[in-house]
Amino acid sequence: METDNLLKYLISQNTEQRIEQIENWQTLMQQSGYTSDYLTATAGTLRTKREIQHCKDVLSDISMKRWNTSLTQGRYSSDQLFFGLNECSGTNKALVDRMKINFNFHKLNFHGFAKYWILNGDFDKMCCYDSDRTKLFLTKKGNHITIDLNGITSSCNITNVFGHLTVDDKFEPNFDILIRIVQKDEYVVCQFINFTFNPKIKFFKQQPFTIEFIGNTLYFCVNSQLIFDVLDGYKGKDDLSLRDYYLCRIAYVNLLKLEHALEQKQKLDLGDENENLAKYVHQLALNALTGVSKLSEETIRTKTLSMELGYKKNIDIGIASQKILINQFTHDLFNNKFVTDFIGWNYTYGECDIEIAPIVCNLLTYLDNESSLLNSGPLSYTLLDEFGGHDRMFILQVKDESGNDYRMLCELQFSLKYKKFSYQGLKVFNADNLEYADCYLFGFGQNQVYGEKQTLNVNSIVSDKQGNLVYHVHALSSLVCRFKVISERIEYLGNALPTFNATLTFNKDLIKMSGNLRLVEDFDGSKKTKYLLSDEFTLENTILVSINFNICEGKQTNSAARYNGKTWPGLRSRDFKNDFYENDFEVVIHNLNYHSQFNEHSNRSDILYSACNCYHFVESDSCFTNRDESYLYWKVNSQTIPMEFDSRPYIKLYNRAFIQIPVLMKGGSNRIIGPKHKCLLNEDYYVNDYQYEITSDSPRVYLPYPNSSQIISIVDSAGKQLSNTLKIESFDVSKFNVLMLPDRFNNSLDVVGELITFKNELELMLRTNNVLYSMLHSLENRIINLERFCEHLNKTYEDKFNKASSIVQFLGDVFIFIGEMSLVQFPVLGIGLIFVGTLLDGMSRILKEDYFDGISEILISSLLLFLGERKMKYSFLEKLGFGKIKTESNLVLNEKVSSVGKRRSYSAYYASDDHKEFDSSLTLRDRLLRQIRSQNPVVFDFHHNSGVMIELKNKQKPSYQALNSSYTRIKRAIGSVGTNNGLERKLNDITSENHYLKSLLITTFDYFTYQVTNSIVIVFKVVFEVKIDGDDRSVEIINKDILYYRNDLEVAFSVFNSCRYDELTDKFPLKFKFEYSDFVNYMYVVCFLSKFGSKDNLLLESYDKFYDSLYLYSSNSDVFSSSINSNNMNRLIYKISHMSAFRTLEQDQDFLTILIRVKDNSSFLRL
């Protein structure tokens, strides 16, 4: 027999055994209920799945070669609407504008950066671009995109194609799509990119659908994390590498969706072909638990249960807290017009007199909030607090077939299904009587006869009613409920789900419900909870929910100054310094007459009076209420000058308002009765006829937007208040079969028998088909590799047939190869064959007169072999298909087992007569599984490979959630950064005045890697020195700089300037094509966006972002500590950050310094 045929014959013995195993497997599956017709019909599905897997492998290979990371390792969540390479920061231009960032002399150019979105899922009219002139709405339903631009509608379809890979249209998945947004001159260009991917030539063909409009891309959300060596769209230069990477990501995810759609189609086809199949699968699943070992009676039991209501009970209607993505619904929450009255006192200056008179006029303003929680971004959300009562539990009486009684708790869960949100305006809400009142702008006007500027100055938001200042919103919704039966001991439900019948009394109506209960398991990170859950039932289809976003609490006018029996807190409008007075701030008393103007014939100083005891919400330095600064949610800029003189009242003087509105006053000569207002004067007074006209854009009132909102009331479509309780009249569950744990066993161990999900009894069958596919695919690859290997040996044999030494060497290789294959199951034989092959290999060298190498090969190889140090060529064996096949388990099982550690292979639980192996070093779980398998190894291994596995897990102790407040994070950061004992002592001080953060001085930096050759990598370090002031909520860029490091030069980070850039341009002209100013501007902008793209409260959330992304330098060590979030750290940076080149910083230099100024009245910010 020829040598190649001999090898094929030897290797085919194992192949024939494999084929025989597959045939036996098929026979066994048919006996378990799988029809031969179905197994035959799955052949086409298996081929399609193989093509999908091939496409996935090609995409992963492309990604790994380009980005040094696999697509399978990338973080992608299906519920994210868009993502960046590492994370996405949803900031837009309006938010950046509100941050009040002072760049000083540091100018940045933000134009020209391409932005990428990946649209996922379905949504309706998402406003992704919102400027004063242009609005862009996106709608995605399935694979159809609709674009509405200023009322002009266009559409496109998602037609991602993967070569010859196709699936039935009825099961086409909901694909993702890539959008590229770039600025070209004055136009915004949006490209919706479809593609065709050919896995054979590894090529993407892009098919973009483009729309253009005049605008600014800064109003689009931006990605905070960008790759520096991809300058896509910057300065008009397009780079397809980033686009191709995103297309790889999308193609990979879409392939997963395609594979899932194929599995769903397979399961549906299977269910249609065989009606009795579910019964067989159910029996197979029961065998997996009850027939696997003799321990089943001790671990799990079959019970027939029935349930009924213990007693009638009234249930509180309560809505759990919820995070609502508001742009998923129809709403007008961004309509921020605020039309209200301006009230106050008007000053008119003449040559010799000052006229002071009440003023009431209508004013149009706009509200701006300082948070992106509620904006036009796709991920904008609000946190809706819990509403209603908590008593939602009732008791069920449970009986089994033996007459034993149990008790189980059942919870009635309520939720709201929102449809539409409607903004009602800025209101004052009184929680005592649930009434809403209007609010107004209060201040003074200045009209100078001889001056050009006339203004209305706003000093407070005021109301005549007590309460809180809120954004008031109405939501159209429906009220639904479902039943949740808490059942820790139920492990598995059968094919027939239990049915229930319930009767409720709600709003005096009798409601009957019926449906099925399914078994659900939740995992909160520390503990698993099992319960039976019903479908949702609608209690009220149309309800109106009143929601408040609380801004701050109002406070009544409070002052010690009294005149003519009334309280008069005051505002100073201007200040005259005159040498005639002993005190520059001395004032005269104004005459007060309700029925005439306020006249003062001295040109000295002015005091503005608030004539009513109103409630003020936002005011300049608490000028009307004298409240403590920390009492306010947010502070208004102003300046305070206290004053006190003789026996006259104590008065605070002010000379700054928080809004100044340029106006033009048109006065008439007619004397008319002035308009009354409940927040100013109720008596009649006379004034010259006048009219105000705003001479510039309508003013904007900046108000904070709270992180959470509260439900105030719920009414039905007729406006009647919904009842806050309902009554459970009856709840019955017919008999059903379950697998239950015994009482005593549940206290020490949980037995989790994850077989098939309650949702689909055919899941197990699908997993089994995957096993068959895996075995067939492995066998095919193995035969292909064997043929290649035999061809190689045959060619080698033919080339060296006439050389005796080559024949000996060839035979040595054959013995070594067969020996390593035999070593898996026959260790002694394998070692013997390897030893013979080693001797033959050494003899071949000796025959070639290479005596030293031949003898050393025999001695050293033999020594390593018998010492057990020679390792098998597992990678080669795996390619040939001789590796162990690790079959996939049930999808749900994978999720459950992940909480208790890696799943052990069944081969680890082999039967052994040596009782020493069951020593104390083995866990109880290991010993139980070994004992279970020893009872019936065949059944155990069969169910294991069928995707059925019994997992035992120890109960886990509940974990305590760490504190998550910013104050705690600041203390923790300081503890790891510096050793300032004084600062640490202040932070640990329990006095209230030290619990306020006034300002942050932060040096933050980013690293950018730039690979110029295969061996040379340049690392740029972009540094920003930033000051964040908590008083006026401003950000100031104090300094910025760039350092760089080259791995081919043994120097530390050095300053990067134009001279260094010219050196790089001369040495690497193809890599550095930009001007120096454009090059550094790009890095500055990317660093700026990554650090200041915070979506929430600027001071706190930006600080959290700094803390989570920086490498913190410790003054106690001369090396950098590891990054706090290592997942976001480039591997190259992680390596070189621990090299000596980084150890050049001075010992006393800290990258994080917190300054706390302690005053009598501390800052508003509470940590």
Swiss-Prot record:
It comes from the Viruses. The lineage of its organism: Viruses, Riboviria, Orthornavirae, Duplornaviricota, Resentoviricetes. The gene is S3. This is Putative structural protein VP3. It comes from Fiji disease virus (isolate Sugarcane) (FDV).
